[in-house]
Amino acid sequence: MTTPSHAIKRGVSLYSFQEEYFLRTLSVEDCIRIAGEIGARGIELIPEQMIPGFPHVSDEFVADWFSWMEQYGTTPVATDLFLDTKRYPDRWLTLEEQVASFHRDIDIAVRLGATVVRAIINTPPEVMEGAAPYAEEKGVRLLLEVHAPFHYEHPWILQHLEVMHRTGSPALGLMPDMGTFVERFPRVVSERALRNGAKP
């Protein structure tokens, strides 16, 4: 067997299997097995989607998780978080509650052996700043996902970059999504939007 001419490692976000998981044609274990079979050794888990009883993470799930990692030759790399700011019908979460939610998700990542937490794009910069010291303490990186229609000169991303540069926190960064490189929507997406009543 020849040695590859690069050191790029392949991983997969289990978000890629969301339809199969939702339709129950694949279990979490199946998703990990398939990832391993195609040579994607790094695994990103979406806890809200794939951990039964989330935000509670049972000892049984953790044991199964590490058993699957060993069995299929995969490694936990990242978890994803969604900041549920509208948890209550009459108000948004306060800054303190949002940071506490991040702490919970950081703890879940640590428990599952992941060193990266991918934060959803709508995460306010002040929440990332507030959670950074805890992430540093736990040895976790908080990376803001960047995908279309956002780009690296978008005002929202610039606000995040200001926090990253000002604090100098090694826990904060950006995670590019391939959608960053989208120049236009695929024709089928535009046509469907028009059929559904969108105005050009």
Which residues does each PLM region occupy?
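N-terminal pre-domain/capping segments
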Residues: M1-T115, P133-E136, S169, A198-K199
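Short beta->alpha linker loops
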Residues: E60, N122-E126, P155
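Active-site groove signature of glycoside hydrolases
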Residues: D105-M128, L143-V146, P170
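Active-site beta-loop-alpha junctions enriched in small/polar residues
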Residues: S13-E19, I46-E48, L81-D84, N122, ...
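Secondary-structure boundary/capping motif
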Residues: L23, F54, V127, Y152-E153
